[in-house]
């Protein structure tokens, strides 16, 4: 960690509508991972900073919860318009601090905007239910209400999209929000809050507290924070879930992944190659929906691998701002070194290294690893088991679909799985027997749109209610059921 002052911008926290200095003397650098250049310094804020944000959010909640739902929706609509106008700008910020290609970054911004659009439909989403006759002259009505101050802890890999899974719906449903963005990619969130303020969001409704573990613990422990949304690693997600639950908070923790993609003999191999190249190596493999294990049916494995390996070799690697670049860097030097160690481990444990991306580490100033492909991988190998979060693909062969599904189901991480096939019967078998929450058929990244939940299984999710879709409305609201008798005897 770099705690020295440099001639770069020092980021502030956003509390009660103002940019304020963190109460800390500890900072770390925000890097452009493609160049190693320092973009800014981010503070390691303290639990005192969290408390200040909670105080502001708690006061703002008293007023915000009373704002009419259509008026809140109008602010969301204005916010959506501003995000569309600034989509290219936001994409460049994402690329500069995260490293992914500009095309991917702009597309990510688009996915975030979709979540804002969904949240803007809050008048319909907040509607309750009623039954006019539960007994003689008695009716019952169910109403939704916001729960209060809520928090969000977001990862580095989608600095635009993941925060937009959280705060737009949270504030649309009447809550106030405290966001802790990743200390590796905090710049996008700064611009997001500026644009929301421009859209007319009142002071204190959305707050940002930058930092690391002290901020996480401050959010988890504060008694006035009622719910916490988290996206990140399995290890940290389990910690967040347990500690937050110990403090009687609602917690949704979306965590690690080891996604398997199966290609059967009847698949369109060219389409499968294209989809899996994007899934495995897009965003440098640093996404929880990446294909990290490829299971090939024996009879087409050699033919597929010839096509796939050549396509991987043709990938353009470099700074995501450069035209035509597909694969950018991993996020930090330590992530690069960790990935290189995994490649060495795979070789030592007996996997066949078909394509080695290690050489890219020496060709660039940033933190690059090229596309890497292993064959002859076994399910007891480290590279099969661990979530590497890198452009490294493990390939396994299977005689048929049941064996391929059995291999995938061995993993304790079950965010998603994909199948390439032309068989309706195979699709049904896959759907009914695979143990994963998000399934792709003839596509490589089965991340759902905003109206459906992001529904990981097993150790890929801790909690009850998922992010996105109707689950997010349920997560950020609680209900009152009013049962009323209206005596009708006077009219008889």
Swiss-Prot record:
Binding positions (NAD(+)): 156, 180, 183-184, 233, 255, 387
Gene Ontology MF annotations: malonate-semialdehyde dehydrogenase (acetylating) activity; methylmalonate-semialdehyde dehydrogenase (acylating, NAD) activity
Active-site residues, Swiss-Prot/TrEMBL: 288 (nucleophile)
PROSITE patterns assigned: ALDEHYDE_DEHYDR_CYS (PS00070)
Alphabetical GO biological process terms: inositol catabolic process; thymine catabolic process; valine catabolic process
The keyword Transmembrane helix is annotated on this UniProt entry: no
The enzyme's E.C. designation: 1.2.1.27
Reactions catalysed according to its record: 3-oxopropanoate + NAD(+) + CoA + H2O = hydrogencarbonate + acetyl-CoA + NADH + H(+); 2-methyl-3-oxopropanoate + NAD(+) + CoA + H2O = propanoyl-CoA + hydrogencarbonate + NADH + H(+)
Transmembrane regions: none
Task of the protein: Catalyzes the oxidation of malonate semialdehyde (MSA) and methylmalonate semialdehyde (MMSA) into acetyl-CoA and propanoyl-CoA, respectively. Is involved in a myo-inositol catabolic pathway. Bicarbonate, and not CO2, is the end-product of the enzymatic reaction.
Subunit structure: Homotetramer.
Annotated protein name in UniProt: Malonate-semialdehyde dehydrogenase
């Amino acid at each position: 960690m770099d705690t020295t002052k440099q001639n770069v911008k020092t980021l502030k926290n956003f509390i009660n509508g103002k940019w304020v200095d963190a109460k800390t003397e500890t900072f770390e650098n925000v890097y452009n991972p493609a160049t190693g250049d320092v973009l800014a310094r981010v503070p390691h804020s303290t639990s005192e900073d969290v408390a200040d944000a909670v105080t502001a959010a708690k006061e703002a909640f008293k007023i915000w919860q009373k704002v009419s739902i259509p008026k809140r929706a109008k602010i969301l609509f204005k916010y959506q318009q501003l995000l569309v106008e600034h989509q290219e700008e936001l994409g460049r910020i994402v690329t500069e601090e995260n490293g992914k290609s500009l095309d991917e970054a702009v597309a990510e911004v688009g996915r975030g905007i979709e979540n804002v659009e969904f949240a803007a439909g809050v008048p319909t989403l907040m509607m309750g239910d009623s039954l006019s006759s539960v007994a003689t002259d008695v009716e019952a009505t169910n109403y939704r209400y916001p729960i209060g101050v809520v928090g969000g802890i977001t990862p580095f890999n989608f600095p635009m999209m993941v925060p937009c899974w959280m705060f737009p719906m949270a504030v649309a449903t009447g809550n106030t929000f405290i966001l802790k963005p990743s200390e590796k990619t905090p710049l996008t969130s700064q611009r997001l809050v500026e644009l929301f303020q421009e859209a007319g969001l009142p002071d204190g409704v959305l707050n940002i507290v930058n930092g690391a573990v002290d901020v996480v613990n401050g959010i988890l422990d504060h008694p006035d924070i009622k719910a916490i949304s988290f996206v990140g690693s399995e290890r940290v997600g389990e910690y967040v879930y347990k500690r937050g639950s110990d403090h009687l908070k609602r917690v949704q923790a979306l965590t690690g992944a080891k996604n398997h993609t199966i290609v059967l003999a009847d698949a369109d191999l060219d389409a499968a190659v294209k989809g899996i190249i994007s899934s495995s190596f897009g965003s440098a493999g640093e996404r929880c929906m990446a294909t990290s294990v490829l299971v090939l049916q024996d009879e087409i494995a050699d033919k597929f691998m010839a096509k796939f390996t050549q396509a991987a070799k043709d990938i353009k690697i470099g700074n995501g701002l450069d035209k035509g670049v597909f694969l950018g860097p991993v996020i930090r030097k330590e992530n690069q070194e960790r990935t290189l160690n995994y490649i060495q481990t795979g070789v030592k444990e007996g996997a066949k290294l078909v394509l080695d991306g290690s050489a890219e580490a020496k060709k660039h100033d940033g933190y690059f690893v090229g596309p890497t492909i292993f064959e002859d991988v076994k399910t007891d190998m480290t590279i099969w088991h661990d979530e590497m979060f890198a452009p490294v693909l493990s390939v396994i062969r299977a005689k048929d679909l049941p064996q391929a599904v059995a291999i995938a189901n061995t993993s304790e991480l079950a965010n998603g799985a994909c199948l390439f096939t032309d068989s309706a019967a195979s699709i049904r078998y896959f759907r009914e027997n695979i143990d994963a929450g998000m399934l792709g058929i003839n596509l490589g990244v089965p991340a759902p749109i905003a109206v459906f939940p992001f529904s990981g299984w097993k150790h890929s999710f801790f909690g009850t209610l998922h992010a996105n879709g109707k689950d997010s409305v349920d997560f950020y609201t609680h209900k009152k059921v009013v049962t009323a008798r209206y005596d009708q005897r006077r009219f008889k």
